[in-house]
């Protein structure tokens, strides 16, 4: 349902990486709040002509938008943008660093099905080394009192990650045995240095989540995945489409979370000014 909360406001989605779920949900979120939403891709911006990111956002700010949503392949890019514009900036994913709104929608999805988050055990499986989703969720989940375990072959585990307070495991079956929630991450081939994995087939032989694995976990263990999904590599088709899977619920909740972010950053200021 469309509401007039942000009528007259302008949101710019500035995405320097491909995106289906995140970009579209930010757009839908803005439009459902009646904001004017402008989408700009890196390929359609003047950065392809040599313009810097800073010059790009300063020029956009000169057009008086109310908020910038930034996704960039470089870690720290949205934080850098905040130093040069006097507008709210939402990090929609920056390199291998963070993806804050994804962790919020993941927590909302889990809470809808588990209630209180405190004490829940979460197993994060997959390409931990290159995953901004893993980093944001480790921080968010621990803040909410959840216990986090990361499961992957050694080359995909960041050195020193134990210092974040997580348990490290290299065996999928053992690692998920006591999990309340299993978060599967895709292998991010676009971010990997060559040679970390011998082959995707070998990875899937040991770390693809299947119904056989789920036969050894609790009946109410939940499966989530931030997408996009590489079917048959990190998760089997039957698990993805099975009753435990909340993958599409996550997508639905992404719109609600991003509407809430826009409202908190823009809507409340309108209410206070009135």
Residue ranges and their predicted role:
Residues 6-11, 118-122, 220:
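Phosphate-coordination loops involved in phosphoryl transfer and adenosine-cofactor binding
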Residues 6-111, 231:
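Phosphate/diphosphate ligand-binding glycine-rich loop within oxidoreductases
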Residues 16-29, 112-185:
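Glycine-rich phosphate/diphosphate-binding loop of Rossmann-like nucleotide-binding domains
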Residues 87, 145-147, 216-222:
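A short helix->loop->beta-strand "cap" motif at the edges of active sites that frequently abuts
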Residues 88-93, 168, 246-249:
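Short hydrophobic/aromatic-enriched beta-strand-loop microsegments
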Residues 161-238:
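Rossmann-like adenosine-cofactor binding region
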Residues 220-221, 226-274:
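Adenosine-phosphate binding glycine-rich loop
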């Amino acid at each position: 349902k469309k509401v007039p909360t942000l009528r007259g406001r302008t949101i710019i989605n500035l995405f320097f990486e491909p995106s289906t779920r995140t970009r579209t949900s930010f757009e839908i979120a803005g439009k459902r709040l009646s904001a004017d939403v402008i989408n700009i891709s890196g390929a359609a911006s003047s950065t392809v002509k040599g313009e810097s990111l800073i010059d790009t956002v300063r020029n956009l700010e000169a057009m008086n938008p109310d908020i910038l949503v930034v996704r960039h392949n470089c870690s720290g890019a949205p934080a850098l943008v905040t130093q040069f514009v006097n507008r709210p900036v939402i990090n929609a994913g920056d390199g291998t660093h963070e993806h804050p709104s994804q962790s919020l929608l993941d927590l909302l999805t889990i809470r809808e099905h588990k209630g209180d988050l405190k004490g829940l055990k979460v197993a994060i499986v997959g390409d931990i080394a290159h995953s901004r989703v893993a980093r944001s969720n480790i921080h968010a989940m621990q803040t909410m009192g959840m216990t986090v375990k990361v499961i992957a072959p050694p080359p995909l585990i960041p050195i020193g990650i134990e210092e974040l307070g997580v348990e490290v495991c290299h065996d999928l079956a053992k690692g998920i045995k006591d999990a309340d929630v299993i978060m599967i991450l895709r292998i991010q081939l676009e971010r990997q240095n060559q040679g970390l994995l011998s082959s995707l087939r070998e990875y899937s032989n040991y770390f693809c989540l299947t119904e056989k694995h789920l036969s050894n976990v609790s009946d109410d263990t939940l499966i989530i995945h931030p997408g996009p999904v590489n079917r048959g590599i990190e998760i089997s088709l039957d698990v993805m489409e099975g009753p435990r899977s909340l993958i599409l619920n996550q997508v639905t909740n992404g719109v609600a979370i991003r509407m809430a972010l826009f409202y908190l950053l823009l809507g409340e200021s309108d209410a206070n000014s009135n």
